[in-house]
């Protein structure tokens, strides 16, 4: 059985950057679960089809492959909008839950898998050998998101970013299905006062103690 590393946490906590580095270091396959709904939505949008069409969206979700996640248009606004439409369809959510579990159980490289998201350790892969909950203060996360936006040339105000972050935290933490909470057996990694290298070293230490 391959090793599964589940990484959860709120927005801008650094979990995506950390997950990619860990996968590269360990020779594991990486799944950015945030892209899978975008990939399904864009499969339809590219073909001129409506992502809100239940039957079409469910079929696209069932046919999703890891190669679809390499598409270069998954970060554009249209992809986010398409993702929002398909994500509201229960059949799509069920198919993509199966996709994530298959990827984790039988990763393409065969050695192991790193998945990051909101509910990997609690819902998608509760059997994961290593579970990390990566977090940081909401103020620090807002600072990081503001910097990301500015580096992309997008104008943003700290107060607005902070308010949006708090609203998203509230929504993620209190939703009825798969709320954002650490798994009972997850190691919590607070990156508020850590740079990327320090967070990476801390995560490697946790993984080493669990394997």
Swiss-Prot record:
It is found in: Cytoplasm. One of its GO terms (molecular function) is dCMP kinase activity. GO terms for biological process: pyrimidine nucleotide metabolic process. It is an enzyme of class 2 (transferase). Its EC number is 2.7.4.25. SUPFAM superfamilies: P-loop containing nucleoside triphosphate hydrolases. Keywords: ATP-binding, Cytoplasm, Kinase, Nucleotide-binding, Transferase. GO terms for cellular component: cytoplasm. ATP binds at residues 9-17. It catalyses: CMP + ATP = CDP + ADP; dCMP + ATP = dCDP + ADP. It comes from the Bacteria. Belongs to the cytidylate kinase family. Type 1 subfamily. This is Cytidylate kinase. It comes from Paramagnetospirillum magneticum (strain ATCC 700264 / AMB-1).
């Amino acid at each position: 059985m391959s090793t599964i590393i589940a990484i959860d946490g709120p927005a801008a906590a650094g979990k995506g950057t950390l997950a990619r580095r860990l996968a590269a270091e360990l020779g594991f396959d990486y799944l950015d679960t945030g892209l899978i709904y975008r990939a399904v939505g864009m499969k339809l949008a590219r073909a001129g089809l409506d992502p809100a069409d239940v039957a079409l969206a469910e079929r696209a979700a069932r046919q999703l492959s890891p190669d679809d996640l390499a598409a270069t248009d998954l970060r554009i606004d249209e992809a986010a909008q398409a993702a929002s439409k398909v994500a509201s369809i229960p059949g799509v959510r069920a198919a993509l839950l199966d996709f994530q579990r298959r990827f984790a159980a039988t990763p393409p490289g065969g050695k192991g898998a790193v998945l990051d998201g909101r509910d990997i350790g609690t819902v998608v892969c509760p059997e994961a050998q290593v579970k990390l909950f990566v977090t940081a203060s909401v103020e620090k996360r807002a600072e990081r998101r503001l910097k990301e936006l500015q580096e992309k040339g997008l104008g943003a105000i700290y107060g607005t970013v902070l308010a949006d972050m708090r609203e998203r935290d509230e929504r993620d933490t209190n939703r009825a299905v798969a709320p954002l909470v650490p798994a009972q057996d997850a190691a919590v990694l607070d990156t508020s006062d850590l740079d990327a290298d320090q967070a990476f070293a801390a995560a490697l230490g946790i993984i080493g103690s669990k394997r």
